[in-house]
A protein has these predicted regions:
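A residue-level detector for the "anchor" residue at the start of short, highly conserved motifs
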Residues: 1-228
Length: 228
């Protein structure tokens, strides 16, 4: 499937006895569609979703990596499961966001509406709207905190909202959307940034704005960006 200048890859896989489709969204774009049960899915740049063409009679299970946002169709007889990076999220009908990129140190599950239960090893974490489960892959264990859901899912609406975010977190988000490699100096990575990035604007526009509001310099050379 062609999406702009990028190739959206879809293929069949075999995770269980059922055949699964694998939808791979490349960098510099996102994708949305509705699954066979009516669940709406938004898939961010550099992300993958594995899902069956038709769900089983007793449950609905998908596998994800990267970042996805789901509005799960209600079905009391068939709970919906999302398996991602060692976490299994169970819902009946709700809206939530998952961020689990392989090259990032944290996996985040954020609930917007409804109620979900996230299973990590032998422990279950129940989330209510506005709560985020954060699992650090390197240091410490899972933790739950209060967040602004509008900020978390702003990427589905054509822009990114950053509120007091570390510049390293900003870079992690923008590198996937713009398809570039962003390297920050040790001093720049911990700078706190607040602002809105329109996904339609060029990367150079953001870099110029960043230089104006922060004490940093930016050097862009093709697909390589250095911030120091």
């Amino acid at each position: 499937i062609m999406l702009g200048d990028s190739l959206l890859s879809q293929k069949e896989d075999s995770i269980t006895a059922d055949n699964y489709n694998t939808l791979e969204v490349p960098l510099k774009c996102d994708f949305r569609f509705t699954m066979s049960d009516g669940t709406k899915v938004w898939i961010n740049a550099g992300s993958t979703l594995k899902y069956p063409a038709k769900f089983a009679a007793d449950s609905r299970t998908v596998y994800a990596s990267g970042e996805i946002y789901l509005e799960v169709a209600k079905d009391a007889e068939r709970p919906f499961y999302v398996v991602v990076d060692g976490i299994t999220v169970k819902v009946l009908g709700t809206s939530f966001n998952i961020r689990a990129y392989a090259d990032e140190n944290e996996t985040k599950v954020t609930l917007l509406e409804g109620k979900i239960a996230a299973q990590i090893n032998d422990k279950e974490y129940t989330l209510t709207p506005g709560k985020q489960l954060k699992c650090d892959k390197t240091f410490g264990g899972p933790s739950v905190r209060t967040v602004d859901p509008a900020e978390i899912v702003s990427w589905t609406r054509g822009y990114y909202i950053f509120k007091k975010a570390r510049l390293q977190e900003v870079a992690n988000t923008l590198k996937n959307w713009y398809g570039v490699n962003i390297v920050l100096s040790s001093g720049a990575s911990d700078i706190i940034y607040t602002g809105v990035v329109n996904k339609e604007e060029k990367l150079e526009v953001f870099l110029r704005r960043l230089e104006e509001v922060s004490n940093v310099k930016c050097n862009c050379n093709g697909k390589f960006v250095t911030i120091y």
